[in-house]
Amino acid sequence: IAMDAPPEREDCRPFLHVAALLRAAGVNAPQVIAQDLARRFLLLTDLGDTTYLSVLNEANADRLFHDAIEALIKWQLASREGELPPYDEALLRRECNLFPEWYVARHLALRLSSAQQQALSDTVALLISRSLAQPAVFVHRDYMPRNLMVSEPNPGVIDFQDAVHGPISYDLVSLTRDAFVSWEEARVIDWAARYWDKAKQRGLPVDPDFSEFYRNFEWMGLQRHLKVLGIFARIHYRDGKGGYLEDTPRFLNYARAVAGRYRELAPLARLIEQLEQRQP
């Protein structure tokens, strides 16, 4: 398959670097057959056109997700500091700021009160602190069913050029609490427990207490949910791409559920309730 990136907008080098890291870890990422970096042209092996998202159902989800978890563990086991940009406080904060800037101010056309701003600021500080306290590994950053291909070996992994070195729970929450498909909480817990058990056996630095690992997983997911709400609004209003706002209720549901389970996040739960009453 040919990849032709506009020279003025795209740098192919991160893609090539992360592809090499994935393949070295034993993950099925596209292999580069030929390249012309000056013209931003790549010739890649084809992983097919069947995404996880296009075929996922109740009957096959466990099999597909078990394969995805195995590939994720291989990727994380290959982690080395200095290979990828850090998922640091500045990046986490920029992502969280997308929520008030694009979802609240632009989509809802609301101005937060000083009390609401403080509640959001305090919550973001908690989320960032917990994220940075997690062990750091390679993070795909969009390890979700739309970017996993049904292939042999399974899965094929794409859209990895924004990979970073950061919180160990991030890719798992991207996989199991997706933008475009939702699962029962019991099933998400089962997948998280399967990952945690296998990761522990293989020597990854997950918390030895599953309840603490799951708390990290949930709080990391909340940071991602706020980010995605902002991104989807930005895609709609700035980039003029329709369809994304239709999936924002799923992320509000994720965020509300997590915020409602933890006493420290109660101010965010109240803020979400207030925002939902003002939906356009």
Annotated model-derived regions:
Residues V206-R215:
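Histidine/acidic-rich helix-loop-helix segments that form or flank divalent-metal centers
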Residues V32, W75, V124-S174, A179-A186:
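Active-site acidic catalytic loop and adjacent metal/ATP-binding pocket
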Residues L64, L91, P135, H140, ...:
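Secondary-structure capping and boundary motifs in well-ordered enzyme cores
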Residues E10, V206, R238-P280:
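Regulatory N- and C-terminal appendages and interdomain linkers associated
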Residues F15, A61-A68, L92, Q117-L120, ...:
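Hydrophobic packing residues in well-ordered alpha-helices of helical domains and bundles
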Residues Y87-L127, D190, R194:
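Active-site catalytic-loop/activation-segment of kinase and kinase-like phosphoryl-transfer enzymes
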Residues L98-H107, I168-P205, W219-D239, F251-V258:
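Active-site activation/catalytic loop segments of kinase-like enzymes and analogous catalytic loops
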Residues I1-R94, L98, V104-A109, L132-A133:
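ATP-binding pocket architecture of kinase catalytic cores
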